[in-house]
Regions:
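Alpha/beta catalytic cores of nucleotide-metabolism and tRNA/nucleoside-modifying enzymes
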Residues: 1-48, 193-205, 212-244
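Conserved N-terminal beta1-alpha1 strand-loop-helix module at the mouth
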Residues: 2-109, 168
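Hydrophobic faces of well-ordered beta-strands that scaffold small-molecule active sites
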Residues: 29-37, 61-64, 82-90, 115-117, ...
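Conserved, mostly hydrophobic/aromatic
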Residues: 34, 72, 107, 150, ...
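Active-site-adjacent beta->alpha loops and helix N-cap segments on the catalytic face
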Residues: 64-83, 94-99, 122-142, 156-162, ...
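Glycine-rich phosphate-binding active-site loops on the catalytic face of alpha/beta enzymes
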Residues: 86-90, 110-124, 171-186, 208-244
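Catalytic cores of alpha/beta
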Residues: 95-106, 157-168, 197, 201, ...
Length: 244
């Protein structure tokens, strides 16, 4: 291919175009990163700073416990640049379906855009798939127009159990799955691949407990569409800086 010669003005314009293109790519990646703020010690000042960072950086979401939803909705303001997610029955999923449904409705009333609900792990381990399916349907009905994501705690599941719960979720119309809460360790890349192989394009996969930009890129390459991290602002800033 013949090399194209550019004068100084054209070269400047070309470099500016590349910079903008790189920045757009970085911003799109940052929009896939969600800020996890579900530690028991997360206080008001940390939540306020987190919401400011999430708005400024245009992160994908701020993920909090139900008791922080109203406060974060206030901190994010009337024109938020990020979404607000409530993590229900975190991290063990041991609440009854009735309690989970009530918590989902309350979180939506308080201002969340999406809810993440942890699966009833014990029911999965016991093979009570009827309970799992009924719960998924009840949660789907409770969310109405709001988005629903199911945390499947894949580290606790055997391969056959993982396949089964993913299939049930997809059949119930659930369009987003979270690999794990992080309470039992982060999801390995082969688990992301395994989930992707089951759900195909029916569900978006959220890979959690990602701590570095390299890990973000690896998880996305494995099929994840969303990233959860306690280090979301730092990762986002590094991503944007690399695009300059």
């Amino acid at each position: 291919m013949e090399e194209i010669e550019m004068n100084e003005t054209e070269l400047q314009q070309f470099n500016e175009y590349k910079r903008k293109l790189n920045l757009q790519t970085a911003e799109a990646q940052v929009a896939k990163i969600e800020y996890s703020l579900v530690d028991a010690t997360t206080n008001k000042s940390l939540l306020k700073k987190a919401c400011q960072d999430a708005n400024s950086l245009k992160l994908g979401a701020v993920c909090v416990l139900p008791n922080a939803v109203r406060l974060c909705s206030h901190f994010l303001g009337s024109n938020p640049q990020t979404s607000l997610i409530a993590c229900i029955s975190y991290p063990h999923g041991g609440d009854t379906t009735k309690i989970k449904v009530k918590a989902v409705k309350e979180a939506i009333k308080d201002g969340v855009d999406e809810v993440e609900v942890t699966v009833p792990v014990a029911c999965i381990k016991e093979g009570d798939w009827g309970y799992v399916k009924r719960e998924f349907k009840a949660l789907k009905k409770a969310t109405k127009k709001s988005a629903l994501r199911i945390n499947i705690e894949c580290n606790l599941l055997a391969p056959a159990e993982l396949t089964k719960v993913c299939n049930i979720a997809a059949d119930c119309g659930i369009t987003s799955l979270r690999t794990s809460s992080g309470f039992y360790g982060s999801a390995k890349s082969d688990m992301i691949t395994a989930i992707k192989n089951v759900v195909k394009d029916k569900c978006t996969i959220k890979a959690d407990c990602v701590s570095t930009l390299v890990d973000v890129e690896a998880a996305l390459s494995m099929g994840a569409g969303i990233i959860g991290s306690k280090n979301a602002p730092d990762i986002a800033r590094l991503c944007l800086k690399a695009a300059e």
